[in-house]
Design a protein with these regions (language model features):
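C-terminal auxiliary extensions adjacent to catalytic cores
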Residues: 1-231
Length: 231
């Protein structure tokens, strides 16, 4: 899946490079005896060509392509969060990664809720804008790409994708802390040879300290900034 998305991203970059280096005027005016390289060429005749090079559909289509990739990446990240917080699939880690079985703390359950909500919102916004052309300029521009809307959607959606990935990193860090503590406890208890005690200790890890909302939001924001600063 990630490979397919990398290919889609590469295609978008290729089209963007072409458009950045393309002539978008209309009409295109070619002076006599001047080649595209601004060198004298006696075979070139002066001419004016009316063309649709101004149209933004090449960019609009690849932006729509990228929009479809974003919720796919986010969905995969959310599924990993769900697997880590579900005791049926997290390979012995405590439910919702909190180690509290008395029901007084929901742990990282709401983290998965947040990721699920973001994935749903991203999937909703992935619908292409370029298929809804609305004529402008007294119908002189009777087919409009809406490429600017597509690009704006991509920018906004990338921020939400980073949010989902930050939530996954936060969850993974909590899971790793538990796994490390459980392994350390197992190693320490193994020296005593009390296997019943070892089994009980591993299956009932101590409750983790639940961060305050402000602390949680600060840490997730720091993860998002780190993602934005990375290559």
């Amino acid at each position: 899946v990630h490979g397919a998305i990398k290919d889609a991203y590469a295609q978008a970059c290729r089209v963007i490079d072409i458009e950045l280096n393309a002539v978008t005027d209309n009409p295109l005016v070619f002076p006599r005896n001047v080649s595209p390289d601004d060198e004298f060429d006696p075979t070139v005749e002066e001419t004016v060509i009316s063309a649709g090079n101004f149209h933004g559909m090449p960019l609009a289509l690849v932006m729509s392509y990228v929009k479809n990739c974003i919720p796919v990446l986010a969905s995969i990240a959310e599924r990993r969060i769900a697997k880590l917080t579900d005791p049926a699939t997290n390979d012995g880690l405590p439910p919702f990664l909190i180690g509290n079985e008395d029901g007084t703390d929901s742990g990282l359950m709401i983290v998965q809720y947040s990721a699920a909500a973001l994935v749903n919102d991203l999937a909703t916004r992935a619908h292409p804008a370029c298929v809804y052309s609305v004529p402008t300029s007294a119908n002189a521009e009777d087919h409009v790409s809406m490429g600017a809307n597509e690009a704006r959607h991509v920018l906004d959606m990338c921020g939400d994708l980073a949010h989902v990935i930050a939530l996954e990193l936060y969850t993974a860090a909590q899971a790793l802390d538990y796994r490390r503590d459980m392994l350390n406890a197992a190693r320490a208890l193994a020296k005593q040879g009390d296997w019943a005690l070892i089994a009980a200790r591993i299956s009932n890890p101590p409750a983790a300290e639940h961060p305050s909302r402000a602390q949680f939001e600060r840490e997730v924001s720091e993860l998002m900034r780190a993602l934005a600063d990375s290559d």
